[in-house]
């Protein structure tokens, strides 16, 4: 379990089904444009179906047990409000993984998602032993891009037609961090930047709140 104030990340459970489905139901229109979909089968390829909730949890647990994934739900003030998964974990000479997430629209803009991502990045670098974390985001997904912008992720370029999202192959921007870029920890850096941007301006000053470093604004899910 990873905790910072009102934000908690814990392993996803089968008994989360009712709360998970309710959050998804209320956020259908908010989430649909950014959700992964299954492409039509080829004449000789297998026919894939969207998994049930239980099938999804079993798959996530299996991948976690194999060391390839870290699946979490996000709680805010004791309520399930989203999901965050570190997937594609690769060891050997790479020691990397990629992060995907979504969050309830009702808590968007409260710092929940940046805090959750910062918590999991620190966990991956300091406890799990990964060296690099990347987040792939559709260019149109401004709410998600703002998450990595706030956290200071570095933009690395475009992957054309990278993932099948909302019924078609979509381009994604790649954002990344390595352990060397946040020796003091990402959560600590995020707290300082958030405090600085929220502090009152001196009389007579103008301008926008402080934005960390230079990356562009998030993984293919709303935040």
Regions found by a protein language model. Name each.
Residues 1-106, 169-223:
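GNAT-family acyltransferases
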Residues 14, 139-141:
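A short coil/beta-turn micro-motif at the C-terminal edge
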Residues 72, 123-125, 153:
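Conserved hydrophobic/aromatic "anchor" residues
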Residues 101-103, 109-123, 142-150:
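Conserved acetyl-CoA-binding loop-helix of GNAT-fold acetyltransferases
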Residues 126-136:
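Conserved GNAT acetyl-CoA-binding A-motif
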Residues 136, 154-171:
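Conserved catalytic-core motifs of GNAT/GCN5-like acyltransferases
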């Amino acid at each position: 379990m990873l905790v910072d104030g009102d934000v908690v990340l814990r392993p996803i459970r089968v008994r989360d089904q009712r709360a998970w489905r309710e959050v998804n139901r209320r956020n259908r229109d908010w989430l649909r444009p950014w959700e992964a979909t299954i492409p039509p089968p080829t004449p000789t390829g297998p026919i894939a179906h969207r998994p049930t909730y239980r099938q999804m949890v079993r798959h996530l647990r299996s991948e976690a047990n194999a060391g390839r994934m870290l699946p979490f739900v996000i709680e805010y003030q004791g309520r399930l409000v989203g999901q965050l998964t570190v997937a594609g974990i690769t060891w050997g000479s790479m020691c990397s993984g990629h992060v995907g997430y979504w969050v309830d629209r009702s808590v968007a803009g409260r710092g929940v998602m940046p805090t959750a991502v910062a918590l999991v990045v620190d966990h991956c670098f300091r406890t799990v032993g990964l060296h690099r974390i990347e987040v792939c985001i559709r260019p149109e997904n401004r709410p998600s891009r703002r998450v990595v912008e706030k956290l200071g992720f570095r933009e690395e370029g475009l992957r054309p037609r990278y993932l099948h999202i909302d019924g078609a192959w979509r381009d994604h921007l790649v954002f990344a961090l390595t352990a060397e870029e946040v020796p003091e920890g990402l959560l600590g850096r995020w707290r300082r930047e958030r405090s600085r941007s929220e502090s009152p301006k001196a009389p007579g000053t103008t301008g926008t709140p402080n934005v960390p470093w230079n990356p562009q604004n998030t993984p293919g899910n709303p935040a």
